[in-house]
Amino acid sequence: MDTLAFINRALVEEGYSLKDIKLVLITDFEPSSVEAIRRLLAVNQGVSFIGRKYVKEVLEKFGLRNVRFRAVEEIPSLEFKLPESGTVKVLPFRNSPQEASAGYLLEEERILFSGKFLGSFGEKGDTIQIFHRVFFPCRNILDYNVGLLESIGEEFEVFPFYGEKQKLSAKTLKEYFNYTVKGSVLEREVILGLVNGVLLNLSDEERENLLSSIGYLAEVDDKVIVDFYTEPNLFYEEFVNTLPDAVKSKEEFYRIVEKLLEHNFYVPLRAV
């Protein structure tokens, strides 16, 4: 999807253009974001950006060194005023042990612009955050993020990175997580079956990309995993976190995730 073209169409429908954008709040950062930001700056050099510190570092590596960028980590009390009016509270989410994103609460309107943590699928009434199990597999990370949501009070409306907008509350999330976490550690043979089921249904290129990232953690024979070189649940965590980068089609990724969701796959705390 051409992100910038999509944004431009939405603006035009409301009587605006890309030149009218004053501030961009970055929740999650993907490879296509660099080019979208570059094209936006070509037509609007006055736009400012707020996001995690690593985003600025990525932009600089791609030659975008003079961008008006403010890192979340540098915002006092994690709150700031909008250029026109209103207050924004920043929620520094964690996506996994390796990654980070951010949510932005428009306090007066009780609207939360969230990343993948609160994503949902389509119109299914029971799909409270399918993505949380992909990008937030560790219980300590879930507790951390739910704690951030508890800090902003009760019910709010979520506009997620993926999926449909929805009404939500920290209490609802907490009850859901506490319920689904039960019996979450998978047996070795279950993990082998799940992982190999995914591998055998990927294209050769996708399988090669996936195994090039995590193959060092397991013994591979004829396109499948036959043994683990680490604790199976820790391998599964790495496997799940690598999937979004390896699978080319978003629809295929959705299908894989729904299949994996037939099993709880929260994992133990990573050893520090």
UniProtKB/Swiss-Prot annotation:
Lineage top rank: taxon: Bacteria
Alphabetic keyword roster: DNA-binding, Transcription, Transcription regulation
Full protein name: Uncharacterized HTH-type transcriptional regulator aq_603
Domain HTH merR-type: 1-27
PROSITE patterns: HTH_MERR_2
Organism encoding this protein: Aquifex aeolicus (strain VF5)
GO biological process: regulation of DNA-templated transcription
Signal peptide annotation: none
GO molecular function, one term: DNA binding
Upper lineage: Bacteria, Pseudomonadati, Aquificota, Aquificia, Aquificales
